[in-house]
Structures are given as structure tokens and as C-alpha cells.
């Protein structure tokens, strides 16, 4: 048996299925929380410098015949730069022929790998380069792991409003969704579910809620979500997501040791999914990280 990490009919835990027709493409937008909540912009491959509004003019009352007040917007600028995100997965020719449905599902899920990496990078403190914003630094946090989950979201809403924002979006990791679904009132009724027969989270304080795996950040405490005013949040893509299939390329990879895989020689082919994307936040004060910590209670003496 070969030692390289290809997917063939002999791959562990793969069950042969009858060949069926299946769609092989699903957009990464459907899998990414930030692609759903933020506003999309189209940018050139070299990036773009966008104008930002940092202050608003102020109106005032005026007595009859008096001079009218003069006030101005204040402006700034922000550089947004895209970076390439890609994944390649090799398959044997026999795998595509004998397990068409499973192959189709693997290809369909490749864009989801792009989406998960995009979200997890944004939630980290390590950007792929300058001009790409991440939330691991410069963003405050609110603990929602206690018994008063509703109160925690009110606190998040207050923090966002203090930064002159309106909470209109919440991205939850599956672990955060579980905390939210477990929130009940004094009668034991769920607070945020769309219904007792539903496994989804309804709007929270009027904010749209989306759930994605890439939001979770392990740690003590773990980050299980982010809430904020997404009006000033942008994600950009150069052109669109691209997918290509090749049976002529030579692949190199490392899984602890170096490997070279000649697709033509091995009767294999590979599927490549790639895109150039970026992420920008105009005001990090209008975003709040949600953790699974239990809020501390401060007591005062008599």
C-alpha cells in the first residue's frame, strides 16, 4: 500500500456506495459566519484604500435671523489587502468512478474548508498580513457562561452602544449555540430558541444570529461567539471562488515527512479550491467577543 495521503477506494472508513448524481458545488458564503454578517465588497488583487468617516457634523438650534452653525464630517482612510486561501485534495480515478456520491460530497465540502479557515483566522490574533483585520486583539469580551445569559447579551448590547453602535449581528460557535439554547426563564421556558421543536437560535435582542464552526477559539475561557454592529464590517473577494481539477500536476506535501505525488503516474487527480479574500473592521469597539466564562459577581459590604 502507498504511504502518501491520497483518497482511494481503500481509504479507511470509506464504504462503497452505488453511483448517484450529486451536485459538487456549494458556496463558502453559506458556511462562513462573517461572510453572512459582514458587507461584501469587490476589491482589486492589489488591495484598496477606502475612505472612512470618523466623525459626524453636529446640528444646533438657531434663533431667527442668527447665523446658522457650520459643522463638518471628519475622515480617515483604511487599507484593505486580499490574501489567497486555498486547499488541494487528491483522489484516485477509481474513487471518482466507484464512489461518485462520496466524491461529490467531498468536493462540495471543500469550500466549507475555505469558510472555516476564513472565520477562524478572523477570530485569531494572527492575520495573513497587513490590511487584514483579526479580532484576537483590540476587542473586549463578555462572559455568557453563567445562568443569566439574557443579561450577558444586554451587557454586550450596552458595550456596543457605548461605542456608538447598534448590535445587529451575532456569530456563534456550536458551543455558543448550546449555551444560548440552554438559557431559560424563571418558568424553565427557553429564551432564545425559535421553538421547542427547533434546534436553531432565533434573533437575540433583534440581532441576526448565525452559527459556524470557525468561530470557536479554545482556551480558558474559550471564545464561543462574537456580537456587534456589522454595518462597519467588510469582507472582500477578488473575483470569485475558483475550483479546478487536474490529473497532470505533481503535488508536494508534508505530513511529518516530505512526499511528492505525481497524479498522472498514480492514476489520480486533484481538486483545487482557492480564493483571494480579506476582512476589515472600521471600529473594533463596536464588536464584543463572547466567552464561556461564568461572570464574576461583586459583593459589597454593609
Model-based region annotation:
Residues 62-68, 105, 185-187, 221-225, ...:
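Short, polar loop/linker segments at the starts of domains and inter-domain junctions
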Residues 76-79, 86-165, 187, 210, ...:
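Alpha-helical scaffold segments that mediate packing/assembly in large oligomeric complexes
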Residues 2-85, 112, 286:
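Assembly/oligomerization interface modules of large self-assembling protein complexes
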Residues 51-54, 92, 173-175, 212, ...:
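Structured loops at beta-to-helix junctions and adjacent beta-edge loops in soluble globular domains
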Amino acid at each position: 500500500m502507498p504511504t502518501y495521503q491520497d483518497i482511494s477506494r481503500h481509504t479507511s472508513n470509506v464504504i462503497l456506495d452505488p453511483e448517484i448524481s450529486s451536485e459538487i458545488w456549494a458556496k463558502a458564503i453559506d458556511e462562513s459566519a462573517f461572510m453572512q454578517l459582514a458587507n461584501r465588497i469587490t476589491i482589486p488583487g492589489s488591495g484598496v484604500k477606502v475612505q472612512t468617516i470618523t466623525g459626524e457634523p453636529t446640528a444646533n438650534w438657531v434663533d431667527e435671523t442668527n447665523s446658522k452653525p457650520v459643522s463638518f464630517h471628519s475622515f480617515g482612510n483604511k487599507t484593505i489587502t486580499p490574501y489567497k486561501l486555498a486547499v488541494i485534495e487528491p483522489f484516485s480515478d477509481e474513487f471518482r468512478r466507484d464512489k461518485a456520491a462520496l466524491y461529490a460530497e467531498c468536493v462540495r465540502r471543500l469550500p466549507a474548508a475555505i469558510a472555516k479557515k476564513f472565520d477562524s483566522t478572523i477570530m485569531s490574533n494572527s492575520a495573513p498580513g497587513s490590511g487584514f483585520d483579526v479580532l484576537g486583539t483590540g476587542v473586549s469580551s463578555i462572559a455568557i457562561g453563567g445562568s443569566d445569559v439574557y443579561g450577558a447579551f444586554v451587557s454586550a448590547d450596552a458595550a456596543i452602544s457605548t461605542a456608538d453602535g447598534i448590535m445587529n449581528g451575532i456569530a456563534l460557535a456550536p458551543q455558543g449555540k448550546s449555551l444560548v439554547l440552554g438559557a431559560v426563564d424563571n418558568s424553565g421556558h427557553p429564551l432564545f430558541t425559535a421553538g421547542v421543536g427547533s434546534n436553531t437560535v432565533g434573533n437575540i435582542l433583534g440581532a441576526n444570529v448565525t452559527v459556524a464552526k470557525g468561530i470557536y477559539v479554545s482556551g480558558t475561557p474559550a471564545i464561543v461567539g462574537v456580537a456587534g454592529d456589522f454595518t462597519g464590517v467588510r469582507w472582500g473577494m477578488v473575483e470569485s471562488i475558483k475550483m479546478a481539477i487536474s490529473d497532470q500536476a505533481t503535488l508536494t506535501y508534508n505530513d511529518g515527512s516530505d512526499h511528492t505525488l505525481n497524479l498522472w503516474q498514480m492514476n489520480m487527480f486533484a481538486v483545487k479550491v482557492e480564493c483571494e479574500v480579506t476582512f476589515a473592521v472600521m471600529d473594533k469597539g463596536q464588536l464584543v467577543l463572547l466567552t464561556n466564562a461564568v461572570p464574576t459577581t461583586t459583593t459589597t459590604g454593609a
